[in-house]
Amino acid sequence: MTVKEKLLKVKQKFKRGDSSSDVDSGPERDRDEDDSDNESRNTSKTSKSSKKSKSGKSTGTSEMTELSDDGGSDIELLPDDGKSFGKRKLQDTDKPCTWNVLVRIIEAKDVSTGSARVRTIFDGNSKMTRTVTHAIPKWRQNILYTIKNQPLEKLAAKVLTLRLVRPTALGESSVGEFSCYLSEVIHSPDRSVIAKWVALGFPGMDDEEPDDIAYENCGFLKVTLSVYRIDESPPTLIDDDGKEQIWSGAHLIDYTLKIRVFSVEQLIRQMINERKIKKKQRFYVMVQCGAHKTETTMESAFLDEDANIASVKFEQEIYLPIQWPTVISEIIFSLFDKKGRGKTCIGKATLPMKMIYEPGETGYLPTFGPAFLNVFDCERVTRFSIFSRKMRGSQQDGSRFVGRLFIAIDCVEYMEKANAQIMHLDHSPIMEAESICKNLEWYNCFCSMSGLNMINPQFASDPVCIMMSIGSFGSTSNEFRSCNSSTLPAEPNWDGCKYFTMPWGNLRPVAEVNAPWEVIEHRIEMSNVLMKMTNMLDTMIWEVRRIGNKAIDHVSSVGMEALECLEQQIDSASKYLGRINPVSSNALDRHILDYRKEKILKLREHFEKEAFSIDYSDGEVDAKLLRMLLKIRSMTLELAEDVQMTIPPVLIKMMSHGKLIGFAKIPISEIFQSDDEAQSGEWCGRTRAINIQWPTLVDQRNRKREHVAVLHAKMWFGRTDQLTKWKEHVQPADIRRFMEMYEVQTKGLALKWKDEADIYDGKWEKTNEVPLENGWNAVGHWIVMNTRHMFVPKLGQHTVHDKAFEIQKRTEDGTWKHFKYTDCYADELKPKDLDKHAKGWEVGSWAQDKFRNNGDEKGWVYSTNGVFFGSGVLTDREEKVHHNFRKRCIKRPRKHEGYNKELEDFEHFRTTMGNENWEYSPSKKEGPYHDLEDRTDRIRRRRYVREVENKDPDSEDPRFRVYEYQMQTGKWQLRCYIMWGNDLLPVVKNSSRAFVRISFAQYSKQTLLVDNSQNPIWNETVMFKSVLIAGGTRDIMKYPPVVSVEVVGECSNNEEANLGHFETKPNVICGNTDVRGTPQWFPLKFSNGRTRGAVLACFELYSEEDKDLIPLEPKCKHNYKERSEIPTEFRPQFDKFHVQFLCWGVRNLKKHKLLAVRRPFVGLTIGDQEFTLQPLKDVRRDPNFPEPMIVFGEVILPSALELSPPLIINLFDARAFNRQPLVGSCLVSDLHKYVSHIVPKVKSDHAERWEQLDLVITEEFDQIIRMVRVPTLTTDPMVPLDWWSRYYASMSQFHRSPGYPESGMEYVRIFRRPLEQMNGYNNFSDFLDTFPFVKSMKGDFDDPEEKEKAGELKCRLLISKLKKGKPPAAINTVVDFVGPTRCLVRVYIIEANGLISNARKGRVDSYVKLHCGKQNVNLKKNYRSECCDPIFGERVDMTVTIPLEKDLKITVMGKRRILSDQEIGSTTIDLENRLLTKWRATGGLSGQFTVQGELQWRDQMTPMEILKSYCYKMMLSVPKIESRQTERGEEKGITIEKITFWFSEVLHVFENEEIAMLNSQRQKAGKENFSDGSDQQNEDVSDGSWDEEDLEREKEKLKWEKHRSKGKPLKKVTTEKAETADGELRKKAKMRIMGSQLQTIALFILRQMNLVPEHVESRPLFSDKGGRTQKGELRMFVDIFPMEYGAIPAPFNIAPRKPINYQLRIAVMDVRGAIPVKRSFAEPVSDLYVKAFINGMTKGHKTDTHFRVLDGTGEFNWRFLLNFDYNPWEKKVVAYTKNRFFCKPVEELVDPILVIELWDKNKFRKDRLLGDIELDLLDFIEGIGSPSDVGVYSTKKRQRGVKCPKCCTRRGCLCKCCIFCFETKCLCGKRKVKKKPFPKPVLFVEPEGYDDTVNIFESRNLYGWWPMLTEEYPHEEPQNAKKKNDDVGKDPKWIMGLVEMDMLLLTKQEADQEPAGKKRSEPNHSPFLEKPDRKSWANSWLVSRIKPCIKYFWHYYGLQILLWLIIIVILILTIFVLLHTWPTILAEIIKAIF
């Protein structure tokens, strides 16, 4: 049976269980659960077999109840609801990655094995856990699999198997197993299944076994499964989350994916080989969905000669199996061409799976179409087929359209077929699909190209052309190229710097494609409406990114504006979706609409939640706002996506010499024209910059430039009846069409041009006629327009225009009326002057001049005073209330009547040209052509064009070229203000030079080369003067041309290095009221979306028509006359700042050029000032600078610090020969972070008050010394209080800390994160910040982790703005320690949780290694064996010198036997920050000043001394001592900063804080809170408390309490008082152990100042191998004791609790009433022995065997000596398991249970367990005084000799007696008796007083009889079955015998003093054991069988044996006599004869 079929059976099982459980009624189910008693008891036996249920119920409820029952457990296993399963879509599942599969085995339940381990099998690898030998096996062990370079969709198809096995002598035997696909884990929330139970099925199933075997359950296994990437952290491993649920792994559902392949349409002509059409060239489609592949049948193509395309009809249906939810990322359709025996893939189409389904309860299954898929292939770029095939195989986005695949996808029920199937379609779906194909509409697509610049110099001398196509329409290739959809090939022009540009001017080429497409406008419009939100967010995200350097005000304004706009757009989109009525749509359209409506509501909720959670005053508001905007953008982008927008994208190809050199794809939706502007595409009719990418991936990876060129184009796509809107977008330009003719001449042998010329048309075909068809008319005459003619003033038309200005004035009623006309010189024109015209001209009417539109939409320019001409004119383009005059330009057409019509004749026009206007080329007819003749030229040509117009709208001719004619061309001036850069990508080591290159229109310029390429300062203005830009002024203002900026670095070999680029649009200025630009930061972008660095710049575009608008040119740079400075008005406003820099010292310096850095020094540069410190003498002795304070009194910086250059800190090393190499550098860009507005405090001098306080402190200290100390607070000597009691009590685990709440001692704070990340400590950087030095070499882009660090600088930066009369802020330099400080560092390692190892068997033999400076401490000897959650309990003392040894690194290692030890994870602590911080992190402050007991105050200073030191350092007022009289006597108080704290108030706050902390712990543990009448909560405690994750032992305690009670009601104990001793008891205890009132108040004040409390921190362990991933966490705390503070206090003893060694002596005397279960020689008989062991023992102790017991009485007199270790704190027994040689045993705490078993020994079969009893040593029943108390009576031995009844009762003859014996086969004449029956066991009934229980640790010595019980009736014979009227009750227990025992408990010391021998060995005492009173033959199995064997055979076969013996003796005697007498007889015979 396959694994898949096994999984199907398991799924059916859980489906049946789930459905039945849902049907059952609630009361019945509750009653069944309450009444049921668990038959599978929770024992500790190692060899007991599981009991099966005998209940006759068959409902699902009873089944699930039986499966979930655990002995004595109240936990109910419920099926996992799976509501979160498969609710999210998976991204990038097809990309290879390295994955970790984590399997955590927690425990097992209801398993029938003693010793067990779990073997995991995944991907062919097998790993296993350690072996445990407990009735409830617990491992808590992690197993990790690492799968490299594999996509998630392939990983999901693999099977994970968990197999529970029992180790045997020859291997292992399987108990049960669980298998699941990994996709079931992947689809779970966070790709993890946390602490769920899985059901173990019957192992070894095959096809021949019945199905019901699959439903048999073998137990449960609790596991955690997780799949995460190598760069992700594993989930939090919680072994008990309070929800006991069964995760069946059966969430996956099998479906069948139905794919209908109708046809391939619009197959391009290149794919058809005409020769093979006759041979029936065939095509087929291969469909790949995950691991399944299938192919359609081969079909022939049908060629349409008119349309020049082909189609292939398939009409087939493919069925593919699929599991749901799925991880398949896409369905791949490959189109193949069959050529003979070979086959070729000619194109592929991919369908993203995530876009055709939606997960979740409201989602839908995959569906698609019927719709088209566009098939693309990559262009052939090389002649070598091998390389071409390789490049095409790796190409992700093809550049050649192949065809359109018409398909439909649906999901149906599973067809129970594992393989794919193919069927032919019926007629009805074909007809439905054809109806969709026939619903077509004619669409037009236009692309008006205004420029193609930044062309790679590689193509400088090549003819370059642009072709456009949509699908198979347009110029698809060089062979199928049409004039109206391509440009004229031309040689690029040099742009004056580096790149090249196409010679396009006012006659812009336009590509046009007209084709029919299916009507999908409703999809495009809906997507565009939703895409508007994404586009708006993109703009806002770009604005936030380029604001730079923490400009909080600007960021806040942008953020609020973005949120307001987003809120409006969400409302609009919601209303729009509500209005949509899906009329003509398929199933996917309807599903997408419902999905969008649902998601838009969730988006609104998410927006409302996130929008109000941002604090705009936060310093990190930019990062938070950016994260929020990116998150919302991803949601809006997902909303807008629609896979059924199936019209092919616009394909723009850049060709040269017929080869593809670059391409770009433009989705139709971006340029779609709709009736509503909101539904139109973002770039519809707008000019945009399109990056032309390289044709292959090889080029994209290896080329230094990211793009081939940049195309500036205006694109439009819409219906044919919407062409008027396209013309509106083009205005004020016109669309013109031209027919073209070429006259070509060649040179002959004489090197002279031939007289004859060839005439070619636009398609380059020879012709003698003008190609003008019907429906087209020529306009104007012929003109010559060669390739390189950029600006064409005339097009051969005989029309000119007169221009004037119209001025209107506002009347009193607000209307506008005509005022006057003027000419261009402001002279007034009369109306009669406007009507005049010269003779010979035909004039038209005056109208608005759209070309000269500098105003609003109608061309008006407004003014207040009516002055529109001259200097100082103030005009505005928008109408306002105060405007009184307005002006616009008007024009009038004028035609010359003397137009020469002869020039319309082509031949005549040729003759008029002479020998001019030729363009030349060396060889090829296609060029490239140039204007000047060269001696190498062999071809020349003239290009004649003539405008044509279309009279018939239905006619078209692809031979006509289309142009956008801009009659208005103006001069413009671009000014680029390049200021400086920030944190650019380093070019090479030790930096270099950099410059900026700017490309605009047809030109490029660059700045000067400046030094320091990482933070360059250019301060230069780059001007582009008199740039001709064709187009109307308003169009340029609305859509300014794009400016491309590159930052380039200069390498040492004079090559250029790309430092990033960006594109922007300049501020267009055409009037005095236009707003000028402001400097902004522009982030530099790289490929793949990476960024690094920014440039501060500004760009302005001026119109040169009005010279007064253009500001004066800035002054020239010094020594560079051709370079200009930044104008004054653009320079940021500067202010004076006061900068303080506390340069404390350098740390962790790395080697530089293989030499250690010995004498480092630091150089600072901020603004225009520099400072250099003196080198250190020897960094190894003192790394701190002797004079660390650097003060810049006045530094001129920009007022807006976000525009400021960064603070540069360079680290140098002073070496021999005056060398000072640069070791590293650090850039501080975020100067806002270090600005301070706080006025410094003035240190007050109150010497007398400080002296008074010293006297009080001395008096308090003397009082403590005189105090009588109580060394211990322990009430129970057996359970002493220790540090672990405090630790467990602080986590609300009071069952592990008995007596601690009553002691009154304080609790400790448990932090769930590192200490420096808690309570606002901010990594303890309040005094010193850590600035990393980075080596000046080429680094990564955005990832600072990959930058190579050279060291660290400990410093403090403070910037304050200088204001008159106010002193600047100052750094508080008061610190306790200045130079190197000797300290004792005490590291307490508590425990580790969730360690993850890559070991094959998942074993972790962990230990701790510490490193600080040159000190290393290795605790390998104290490793913890095979434990993922080890308890270390280690304390390490290290004497270090801070800061020389400041980094403490704690590493958890994994011990290995042969290989080197493996590092699991490490964490690092900065000791210097903890020593110098104001939060006093040297040692945590205790919760109270405890001076009594085991855990006293452990600080070097008293609270009063600490308070004095803190107030002095923080410049606070001197604390004042107060006192007052109360009812309880004198009460002390302390006044500080005018606030008085009294002792009574402090006590009340302490109590509330303690209760709040415990409530927080209990809430996380799922318990009820304590109540003290106060609702006050401690926020810090709640935030920093540890999540309770170890509740299992507490649950076990409650479970065993119920088990011990045996069904009796538990004693009611007050939980609060039992666990916390809350109330007066604890208050009194606290008052006894606390110090004086002043010390308590001082401690309270210190804790209110947020000083570090006494704590245990949880530090994550990270491993750098294979990515920085978390490998667990470590609980620990560190104390730092400076030596100069005096004596070091005694340390805590945190060593793991040592158990107490005990010896339990059990004397087994007799056994009474043993029920035999076998027969021996027809008699019921038993071979008895007794076995005893304590839970956790690997081997039990047995007595000898009393053989052949007939009366149930066994004599033993045998002593057991059971040694065990007992943990009195947790009341557990320590179990030791050793699975490997040379390895420590594994310790585990188990319940203290003594098991006594009565066994029947079998010689040739397994021994049989008769009965047992489990005695909880803490609470078990006392022995029975007499066997008769339970109905067991001892009987006397019977006489075995029986006389014959016939002989004894009647006198008869011997003959009759013999005859009777012969008949009965009995010599004694006894009648034949029946077989003796088995004795009937006694039903166990509890005697009186049985409820009383005893504790062996209290009683110490016990004697009595204990029953051996069983729940199964021992015999199955009908005559021994219970009768119908027997009242046995529910769940009866039968007594199989009584064992007489004497138990004595001794400690190890007592046992050594009074030893006793095992068995009956000496010394034999307490009690003295004699030899058992049994027959000698009862000691051996063989001897005990001889006598009954003889008796048995004599009884049944004695007469036969006797008769046969007599006969044999007679025969022998006869033969003997004959032998002796034979000679005599023979002699007598002979004599008689003779």
From Swiss-Prot:
<feature type="region of interest" description="Disordered">
    <location>
        <begin position="1563"/>
        <end position="1619"/>
    </location>
</feature>
<dbReference type="InterPro" id="IPR055072">
    <property type="entry name" value="Ferlin_DSRM"/>
</dbReference>
<feature type="domain" description="C2 3">
    <location>
        <begin position="1120"/>
        <end position="1246"/>
    </location>
</feature>
<comment type="function">
    <text>Required for the fusion of the membranous organelles (MOs) with the plasma membrane, a process essential in spermiogenesis.</text>
</comment>
<dbReference type="InterPro" id="IPR000008">
    <property type="entry name" value="C2_dom"/>
</dbReference>
<dbReference type="InterPro" id="IPR037721">
    <property type="entry name" value="Ferlin"/>
</dbReference>
<dbReference type="GO" id="GO:0061025">
    <property type="term" value="P:membrane fusion"/>
</dbReference>
<keyword id="KW-0217">Developmental protein</keyword>
<feature type="domain" description="C2 4">
    <location>
        <begin position="1363"/>
        <end position="1484"/>
    </location>
</feature>
<feature type="topological domain" description="Extracellular">
    <location>
        <begin position="2020"/>
        <end position="2034"/>
    </location>
</feature>
<dbReference type="GO" id="GO:0033292">
    <property type="term" value="P:T-tubule organization"/>
</dbReference>
<dbReference type="GO" id="GO:0005544">
    <property type="term" value="F:calcium-dependent phospholipid binding"/>
</dbReference>
<dbReference type="GO" id="GO:0005886">
    <property type="term" value="C:plasma membrane"/>
</dbReference>
<dbReference type="InterPro" id="IPR037725">
    <property type="entry name" value="C2F_Ferlin"/>
</dbReference>
<keyword id="KW-1133">Transmembrane helix</keyword>
<feature type="topological domain" description="Cytoplasmic">
    <location>
        <begin position="1"/>
        <end position="1998"/>
    </location>
</feature>
<feature type="transmembrane region" description="Helical">
    <location>
        <begin position="1999"/>
        <end position="2019"/>
    </location>
</feature>
<feature type="compositionally biased region" description="Acidic residues">
    <location>
        <begin position="66"/>
        <end position="79"/>
    </location>
</feature>
<dbReference type="InterPro" id="IPR006614">
    <property type="entry name" value="Peroxin/Ferlin"/>
</dbReference>
<dbReference type="Pfam" id="PF22901">
    <property type="entry name" value="dsrm_Ferlin"/>
</dbReference>
<dbReference type="InterPro" id="IPR035892">
    <property type="entry name" value="C2_domain_sf"/>
</dbReference>
<comment type="similarity">
    <text>Belongs to the ferlin family.</text>
</comment>
<dbReference type="GO" id="GO:0007009">
    <property type="term" value="P:plasma membrane organization"/>
</dbReference>
<dbReference type="GO" id="GO:0031260">
    <property type="term" value="C:pseudopodium membrane"/>
</dbReference>
<dbReference type="GO" id="GO:0032809">
    <property type="term" value="C:neuronal cell body membrane"/>
</dbReference>
<keyword id="KW-0221">Differentiation</keyword>
<dbReference type="GO" id="GO:0031090">
    <property type="term" value="C:organelle membrane"/>
</dbReference>
<dbReference type="Pfam" id="PF16165">
    <property type="entry name" value="Ferlin_C"/>
</dbReference>
<feature type="compositionally biased region" description="Acidic residues">
    <location>
        <begin position="1577"/>
        <end position="1591"/>
    </location>
</feature>
<dbReference type="GO" id="GO:0031268">
    <property type="term" value="P:pseudopodium organization"/>
</dbReference>
<dbReference type="Pfam" id="PF08165">
    <property type="entry name" value="FerA"/>
</dbReference>
<dbReference type="GO" id="GO:0097723">
    <property type="term" value="P:amoeboid sperm motility"/>
</dbReference>
<keyword id="KW-0472">Membrane</keyword>
<dbReference type="InterPro" id="IPR012561">
    <property type="entry name" value="Ferlin_B-domain"/>
</dbReference>
<dbReference type="GO" id="GO:0001778">
    <property type="term" value="P:plasma membrane repair"/>
</dbReference>
<dbReference type="Pfam" id="PF00168">
    <property type="entry name" value="C2"/>
</dbReference>
<protein>
    <recommendedName>
        <fullName>Sperm vesicle fusion protein fer-1</fullName>
    </recommendedName>
</protein>
<dbReference type="InterPro" id="IPR032362">
    <property type="entry name" value="Ferlin_C"/>
</dbReference>
<dbReference type="InterPro" id="IPR012560">
    <property type="entry name" value="Ferlin_A-domain"/>
</dbReference>
<feature type="compositionally biased region" description="Basic residues">
    <location>
        <begin position="1600"/>
        <end position="1611"/>
    </location>
</feature>
<feature type="region of interest" description="Disordered">
    <location>
        <begin position="1"/>
        <end position="80"/>
    </location>
</feature>
<keyword id="KW-0677">Repeat</keyword>
